[in-house]
């Protein structure tokens, strides 16, 4: 299966080339494929904040490379470069508050920095760590794809209709994808009849990115407005809703793109199974429940304007980027460490005590 999955890979969003971080500008897809080069931590932080790069794993990977770029600049300046590098850690940490992969990657880079020995080359050590973070995420995606596909096949061996939300493919990760990785694997095994992709307002990640990724691979996909999801579950024999996650707490609550919570509520009402796919770096065991997750809110103009023109006069906008789905609405959380069915605090703790499967 691994070889077939790798052969099917067509899209990537992050490149580390000759000491430069190259990011595919996802704001312009699918009309334009433009790669932007970043050579400083500040540029990477701005790219994360402005959503040049998005998706929790991809944000974490980009931040890790941002620290490499920051270290290069601080070392060139001389003096106490480690103290100066703390400003780059802070700048990157402030770029997006909800995706825990960002903080996980930064903590891993800081830990590696603190473990350096006398005689180590700081830049080489940090670069190797960032590359390891990137490669590990890609391997985790391949493992999760297999595990999630097996869950789908276990329920029903014939082709199924699946609903997904936002974008969780290669564009959101170090390669291949989380929820879309599972969908890709299921397609290769003949388990997909059709994928229904929520458009995902207001940034339209579903229509611009997910539909584009799936169509490029010949996977049958239909786009729907977000508010059609319950109707689809009622009329189109949807068997699974499969989504990613930006943060998962110790009890199994899941923060993901706004609209995920209502999908889970509707899925339970219609008897549709609900799967969350995310690497263990997304799990924050320091937070007891979803009530503790900071929810990012973005500029209301994302709702009030279309193409730079105001469409709703003299009103305010409420624009949270994420919501929290309670664990009791989730059938399975799939990670590279294994699968947790009907997640709760005890099962999540058991999962995190396991070694990685890949």
Curated annotation (Swiss-Prot):
GO process terms (BP): L-methionine salvage from methylthioadenosine
Enzyme's top EC category: isomerase
A GO MF term: S-methyl-5-thioribose-1-phosphate isomerase activity
TM region positions: none
Pathway note: Amino-acid biosynthesis; L-methionine biosynthesis via salvage pathway; L-methionine from S-methyl-5-thio-alpha-D-ribose 1-phosphate: step 1/6
Residues binding substrate, per UniProt: 54-56, 96, 205, 256-257
UniProt-annotated catalytic positions: 246
Site feature: Transition state stabilizer: 166
Keyword terms, alphabetized: Amino-acid biosynthesis, Isomerase, Methionine biosynthesis
InterPro entries reported in the protein's UniProt record: IF-2B-related, IF-M1Pi, IF_2B-like_C, Initiation_fac_2B_a/b/d, M1Pi_N, NagB/RpiA_transferase-like
Reaction(s) catalysed (UniProt annotation): 5-(methylsulfanyl)-alpha-D-ribose 1-phosphate = 5-(methylsulfanyl)-D-ribulose 1-phosphate
EC number(s) stated in the UniProt entry for this protein: 5.3.1.23
PANTHER family in alphabetical order: METHYLTHIORIBOSE-1-PHOSPHATE ISOMERASE (PTHR43475:SF1)
HAMAP family registered for this protein in UniProt: Salvage_MtnA
General function of this protein: Catalyzes the interconversion of methylthioribose-1-phosphate (MTR-1-P) into methylthioribulose-1-phosphate (MTRu-1-P).
Family in the record: Belongs to the eIF-2B alpha/beta/delta subunits family. MtnA subfamily.
Entry protein name: Methylthioribose-1-phosphate isomerase
Organism: Pseudomonas aeruginosa (strain ATCC 15692 / DSM 22644 / CIP 104116 / JCM 14847 / LMG 12228 / 1C / PRS 101 / PAO1)
């Amino acid at each position: 299966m691994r070889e077939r999955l790798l052969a099917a890979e067509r899209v990537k969003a992050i490149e580390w080339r000759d000491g430069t971080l190259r990011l595919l500008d996802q704001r312009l897809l699918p009309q334009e494929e433009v790669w932007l080069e970043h050579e400083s931590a500040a540029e990477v932080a701005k790219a994360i904040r402005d959503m040049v790069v998005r998706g929790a794993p991809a944000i974490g990977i980009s931040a890790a490379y941002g620290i490499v770029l920051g270290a290069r600049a601080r070392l060139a300046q001389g003096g106490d470069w480690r103290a100066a590098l703390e400003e780059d850690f802070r700048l990157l940490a402030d770029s997006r508050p909800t995706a825990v992969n960002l903080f996980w990657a930064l903590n891993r880079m800081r830990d590696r920095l603190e473990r350096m020995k006398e005689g180590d080359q700081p830049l080489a050590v940090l670069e190797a760590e960032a590359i390891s973070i990137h490669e590990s995420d890609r391997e985790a995606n391949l493992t999760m794809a297999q595990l999630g596909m097996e869950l789908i096949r276990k329920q029903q061996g014939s082709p199924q209709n699946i609903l997904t939300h936002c974008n969780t493919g290669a564009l959101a990760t170090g390669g291949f994808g989380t929820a879309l990785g599972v969908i890709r694997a299921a397609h290769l095994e003949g388990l997909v009849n059709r994928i229904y992709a929520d458009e995902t307002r207001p940034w339209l990640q579903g229509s611009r990115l997910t539909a584009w990724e799936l169509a490029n691979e010949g996977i049958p996909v239909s786009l729907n407005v977000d508010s059609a999801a319950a109707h689809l579950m009622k009329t189109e024999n949807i068997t699974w809703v499969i989504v990613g996650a930006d943060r998962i707490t110790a009890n199994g609550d899941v923060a993901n793109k706004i609209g995920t919570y209502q999908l889970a509520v509707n899925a339970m009402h219609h008897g549709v199974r609900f799967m969350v796919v995310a690497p263990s770096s997304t799990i924050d065991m320091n937070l007891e429940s979803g009530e503790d997750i900071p929810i990012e809110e973005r500029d209301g103009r994302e709702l009030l304007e279309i193409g730079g023109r105001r469409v709703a006069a003299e009103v305010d906008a409420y624009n949270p980027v994420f919501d929290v789905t309670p664990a009791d609405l989730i059938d399975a959380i799939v990670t590279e460490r294994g699968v947790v069915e009907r997640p709760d605090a005890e099962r999540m703790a058991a999962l995190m005590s396991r070694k990685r499967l890949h």
